[in-house]
Structure formats: C-alpha cells, structure tokens
C-alpha cells in the first residue's frame, strides 16, 4: 500500500523527471526540480512545472517551501510564500495533480531556471481541523492549480 510520495504525471513520463529525495538523513524537505527550462524577464511571474504529482493519506498535506538560496543566488521567490498541495489534488480531472512552482523574478535581469534544477522543498505534514468542521458542507475538487478559490 502506498502511503505518501511522488509520481511522474503522464505528460512527463519519458522526460527524465527525478523523483524528489531528501538530501541528508535529517532533512525535512524533498528537493523538487524544474521539469523544463524556464526563463523569467525582470519582474515576471511564471509557473515552473515539476512534472510530478503527490499522494498522501487523509489528514496530511504537502507544503512546498522556497529554497533558502533562491532569493540570494537566483533573484527568485516563491510568490505565494508556501505552496499547499492537498490530498484531493492528486489525480484531479483538470491536470492529473501536476504540481507547479509559482515564482517571481525580482531582479532587473533575465533569470533562467534549468531543467533538473532544484527550486523548492516539499514537506509532508499532518494538519488539524477546527471544531464543527465535520458538520460543514464540503465541495468536491473538480479542478487543478488554483481551483479551490478565486
């Protein structure tokens, strides 16, 4: 039985995508790489594809955090500060659960992220819900990136 982890989405099956791994024994984060080379003009915001989807258990979430070296070395920041990948994003009908990294170039020069370059760290975590949450009506996920809000 699969508990939690990463899989390559169909579109990238033959693209040489690496399954994320932890760099050291005590690392919390799994290094997630760019699936394609992406160029950023000064000030530009773009989505970098990972070629990956993540599966996990109920009551768990995958947080995607910016690598600490990105602002200093690349001039890039994860624009939403933390990416939140919910359990029901996996295999959604819109994009198969393909995870993207939304980055912004805050420099005055073009910045390039190469295919295979580590961009964010994924950390699996349990989460809690508020009292009465089980009594609130929930919608079923029907879309992909950014589909649960405006």
Curated annotation (Swiss-Prot):
Tell me the domain of life.
Answer: Bacteria
Quote the InterPro entries the UniProt record gives.
dUTPase (IPR008181), dUTPase-like (IPR029054), dUTPase-like_sf (IPR036157), dUTPase_trimeric (IPR033704)
Cofactor(s) needed for function: Mg(2+)
Keyword Translocase assigned to the entry: answer is no
Its family remark reads: Belongs to the dUTPase family.
Q: What does this protein do?
A: This enzyme is involved in nucleotide metabolism: it produces dUMP, the immediate precursor of thymidine nucleotides and it decreases the intracellular concentration of dUTP so that uracil cannot be incorporated into DNA.
User: What name does this protein carry?
Assistant: Deoxyuridine 5'-triphosphate nucleotidohydrolase
- The encoding gene is dut
